[in-house]
Amino acid sequence: MRLMPAFLSGFRINHCLKHLRRPRIAGGLLGLALGFGGGACGPAELAGDTWTLREAHGSAESGNGLSTNGLSTNGLSTNGLSTHGLSINGLSTIEFSHWFNQDPARADELMRYIIRCAAKANQQRKYTNPVTGVKYTWEGGLGLAPNWATGAPATAQEEEIVSACLAAHANKFGISVAISVLGRDARDSALPYTEQELSTFSEREACFFGNLFDGTGVFAATDRGYLREDESTVRACGLPSSPAHADCLPIIHAGTCESLCQRAATAALPFGWESGEPPYYETCTYNGRTFQPLTTRLQPRDIHRCGDGVCQLTERCGDGVVAGSCQADCGTCPY
C-alpha cells in the first residue's frame, strides 16, 4: 500500500484559544466558500506528508485516511471565521480578508488544515491576499464536509466533523507525525481503510469531537489507556500520561473513548476486523451533548520509551528511568 500525502498531525495548539465559549458569529469569516480549484487559500504548509485511513474499497491512489499532524494548538481558534461556504466567492469577501490579515501566518496554517479536512484530495482553494498580494494555495484531502467545501453553508454535522479533524491534527509541539484517521464524513460515508493500514498503525490513540465554530470547544479522549511513566509522545493531546498532564488547550481532555463513545456497527465495516471490534467510534457524548467524532491510530515507533537509546524531544535528562528523567537516553543533567 502506498501512503498518499494528505495531512500531518502537527498543527500547533493555540494557547490564545483557551476561552472558546463565544457566541456564534452569523456569517463570520468562516463564510469561506471553498471554491475548488479556484481561488482561496489557507493555513501554513504542513511540515510533512499526511495520510488518513480512507482506502477501504479503493486503491491507495484514490486517497486514504492516513495523515500527518502538525497544526499548532495555537492555531485552533476559529473566532471570526464564518461557516457560510468554502468557495471562491466566500474567500473574496471583505470579512474574510479582515479575519485573515489579523494574523496571516496563523490564518494560513488554519486554512490549510480546514481545506484538507473539508475538501476532497482532487480539490484546492487559491487565495490572493488583497492587502499584501501574497498568493496561497490550499489542497483538499479527506473530503469530510462536501457541502461546505462546494460553497454551501456548513451544516452542524460538518462543523463537528471538521472540528474533530482539526483537533486530531493538532499537537502542542507542532511536530509532524503520521496518523491514521478513522470515522465518517458529514454524509455518513465511512473513510476507507485497509487491513494493512490498521496493522501498520497498530497503536490506538484517541477520539476527537466537539464544535469549534459554535463556542462549544473541542475534546479528546484516550483510546488505549494513559502512557506509562517511561513512555512519551508528541501526540500528548490525544495520549497523555494522565488526565492532569493533558495540557493541550483549547483541546479539553474528556476521559476515555470507551466510557464516552459508541463504536461503529460491525455491519458498517468494509471487512471483518480480527478482534471483532470496529476500529472507530460513531458518536461520543459529553456534557449531555452527542457529537460525531474521528478516531486516530499511531505507529508504534511514535510512542517513545525511556531506554530505547534515543533522547526524544519528549524526554529529559536526569538519573531516573521515566520520560521526565531518562538517564539511559538523555544522560544525567549537567547541573
Where do the PLM segments sit?
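N-terminal secretory signal peptides that target proteins for export/translocation
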Residues: M1-R22
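Bacterial N-terminal signal peptides
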Residues: G27-G37
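Bacterial signal peptide processing site
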Residues: G42-A44
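Post-signal peptide N-terminal segment of mature Sec-exported envelope proteins
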Residues: D49-G70
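Long, low-hydrophobicity ectodomains and other hydrophilic envelope-associated domains
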Residues: S77, S82-R301
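Cysteine-rich modules of extracellular adhesion/ECM and protease-associated proteins
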Residues: I303-Y335
